[in-house]
Each structure stands twice: as C-alpha cells, then as structure tokens.
C-alpha cells in the first residue's frame, strides 16, 4: 500500500461538546498538544489563528496496530503511518457555543460529547449540547466518559449506565462510549481508533462555488510600522464549500456601513487573497477543514478587532443578498434546556427582541409581526444569507440569553 502523503490542512472538523469543566479543553490538549483557550498569546503571535481550533494527525503503527498522534509508536517505537489530519473545534463559552453550534457555523462534521464520570449524568449543558446536535442532524458522535481516574470501578459502571439511559432514543443512542482520562492520557489510542471508525471525512465537491464564514479578523501590523511595510487585513474563518486560491478576487458581505448624504447603507468589500495559512502552514489553496487565515489587500483598519466577524466571503457576484429584515419559520423547543427549572417556552410575540445567529454572525432583531410559527424580524445588523439558511433563536430568560429553538429563512 502506498504511503498516504501527509496533509497540510485538516480534512474534517470535530466539535468538542459537553458540560462546563467536564474536560473538553484537557481532552483537546491530550489529542493535539494545544491548549485552545489562549487568546492573548494567539494575538501576540500574529496569524496562528485558531478559534479554539486545534489540529492533530491520526497515525497508526504498522507493526503493532497502535493508534497514536506521534511519528513513533509509543509501544514498540516503530515509525507510524499517517492516516489523516483532523481539526477539533473547542468552543469556550457554552451559551455562545450553543448559538454558534445551532446556526451551523461551527461546521462540525462530527462531535465528541464529553461526560465526566464523577458527576451524575446528564448535567444541564450535556442535555443542551446533545439537543443542539439533534437539531443540526450531526449523527457522527462519540461519547467520551472522562475523569475515570477520579472514580472507582463501581462508580464508573453506574455512570456508564446513566449515560446509556440518557442517550436512549436520541441521535447518540448507538454512539460508542469510551472511558478515558484526558489528564493521564489514558485510552487516547482507543479514542483515536474510534474517530477513524465513526467520524469519516465527508465527501466534498471541489468544484462548488467557494464560500467562507469569517470567525475573526485582525490587523497584524505592529504599532509604528512604516507605511511601505504595512500588511493588509487578515480574515480567519471556516470554508464551508469549494476551494479558495491565492490570487483569487473575493467579495465580503455585508461589508461596511457607508453614509452618503442622508442615506446609510451597507457596501460589500472586494479584495484579493495574497496569502492562505492553516495554523503555521502556508497554503497555495484551501478547502473545507480547520480554521484558515486569509491575508488580503484590505486596509487593516477595516479588519482590526474582529470588525468583519460574521461576514461571508465568496467570489464576486456569487454571494447571497444582504438582508436587513427577514421572515423566518420558527421551530421552538418545548422547554428552555440548560436551566434548572426547564421553563416552558412561550410562542414568539410581536415587539419582542431576539438574539439571532446565522453562520458566524450574531445580531439582535425585533419582531415586527408574529403569526403562528412565522415571524417578520427587523435586524439591528444586516446579514448575508440564503433562503433556507438556519438561524438559531435566543430569548432573554432572566438575566441571560437562552436558546429557544431555530428558524429557517423564508424571505
């Protein structure tokens, strides 16, 4: 068998989901060697943009069959063979995660649901995240029973039975449950094999019209840089389809707010791709998988401090329209998941303010007319979206925004 060439870019995105403090970030660290919550360091280093994305190589030992992320087998020290490169999306804040997950922006091809063995199952966010996977139809799921080093065998078995009971009748009913200790890196090899077996790389169409969601944007120039040495603005995001190449002319929507006379409107930006990077690897072209840094000729003032987060990038003339109002058909959940009380969700009503997530965009909206499950919404910030796109809907419950369902754009 010919050796598989090592990939420069990840080919599949796997979401790390689960209750707070159940070990998502530690597990990402055990798999990739990267702590994903490290924003200030990330900005200091410039362009290694990973929005809590971290990649790892899955490798297999040809001698003893061990799965590992290392070039040499930890068991027999033979040289290992490269299988594929995967990217883990470890989203930090759980409430924003819920909305982002639901709007499909995190573009997960599969998910690892992390459940701690030393707490009763399910915890509120465990329920909330599994519901999000259900709504999104993400059915390539592996359940990780973490922190088994903190419980005895009997407790581990009881927790395992609780997990089985919890997932019965859900999208994760047949998901494998793998006991591990992320802290001691125990059973990580078994998890790597499960990722290979249960979360395949989806078939992607390289000829599809390229499109990308912008998750971050920055100015990478140091203060005091000479004008001749200034670099253009940088976009960090996830490609959802097609292939972008260095040299491509691109359009960014909704763009920037422009006032001419007494009229204010949003004007799309056009620019050129001058560089592409996945982590620290420079690319000539980029496909879906992992987070991609896109260097442009834009004035860095336009991209600083995440100013273009929520935008959509494509080839000129191929993007959906900019919408300042939308009509959605809402699918509301029965109860507010993730709260202790699990309050009943009331229907949408005219005049109410909602928080909406579409792609990587977040905007507030006021319902101008609600009739049954159809609502007309005026948006505070415009979005670039197609008919049929999904919108995550959150409502103020007490002092925080709570996910109450999703909608489909109808107009």
UniProtKB/Swiss-Prot annotation:
One protein family per Pfam: GTP_EFTU
HAMAP family on file: eIF_2_gamma
Residue ranges of the region described as G2: 46-50
EC number: 3.6.5.3
Catalytic activity: GTP + H2O = GDP + phosphate + H(+)
Keyword terms of this UniProt record: GTP-binding, Hydrolase, Initiation factor, Magnesium, Metal-binding, Nucleotide-binding, Protein biosynthesis, Zinc
Quaternary structure and partners: Heterotrimer composed of an alpha, a beta and a gamma chain.
GO molecular function list: GTP binding; GTPase activity; metal ion binding; translation elongation factor activity; translation initiation factor activity; tRNA binding
Region entry G3, spans: 90-93
Residues that hold Zn(2+) according to the record: 61, 64, 73, 76
UniProt function note: eIF-2 functions in the early steps of protein synthesis by forming a ternary complex with GTP and initiator tRNA.
Start and end residues of each tr-type G domain: 9-203
One of the protein's GO biological processes: formation of translation preinitiation complex
Protein name: Translation initiation factor 2 subunit gamma
Region (G1): 18-25
Cofactor(s) needed by this chain: Mg(2+)
Region called G4, residue ranges: 146-149
Primary enzyme class: hydrolase
Binding residues annotated for GTP, in chain numbering: 21-26, 146-149, 181-183
Gene3D superfamilies in alphabetical order: P-loop containing nucleotide triphosphate hydrolases, Translation factors
